[in-house]
């Protein structure tokens, strides 16, 4: 899955505050497709891990959005949709960067509810 595919997959899931469950499941599916181990923790946050050992680095972004559905569309090199830049865009960037990282250590990406 390329960068645009990762972002599109996350943005396509509607996730207004308090109703993030489906978006967390999508985050987990996307993470696993990139080679992460991933699960939801006890409060519903999506936790994705790749690599092992030290150093350990964590990226955290919120997965909820404001209410109101917007159509997801690609317009040239811009993806439009709820959460594309706040903060699903940052989560997508963290997942792709961690997936491509070939150095030592563990990277944890958290999609917080």
Residue ranges and their predicted role:
Residues 1-58:
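N-terminal helical capping/dimerization or prosegment-like subdomains
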Residues 42, 111-113:
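A general secondary-structure junction signal
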Residues 54-111:
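Active-site metal-coordination/substrate-binding segment of hydrolases
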């Amino acid at each position: 899955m390329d960068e645009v595919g990762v972002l599109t997959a996350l943005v396509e899931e509607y996730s207004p505050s308090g109703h993030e469950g489906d978006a967390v499941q999508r985050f987990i599916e996307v993470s696993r497709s990139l080679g992460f181990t991933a699960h939801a923790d006890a409060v519903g946050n999506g936790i994705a891990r790749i690599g092992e050992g030290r150093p350990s680095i964590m990226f955290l972004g919120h997965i909820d959005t404001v209410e109101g559905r917007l159509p997801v569309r690609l317009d040239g090199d811009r993806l439009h949709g709820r959460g594309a830049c706040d903060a699903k865009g940052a989560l997508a960037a963290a997942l792709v960067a961690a997936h491509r990282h070939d150095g030592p250590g563990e990277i944890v990406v958290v999609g917080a509810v």
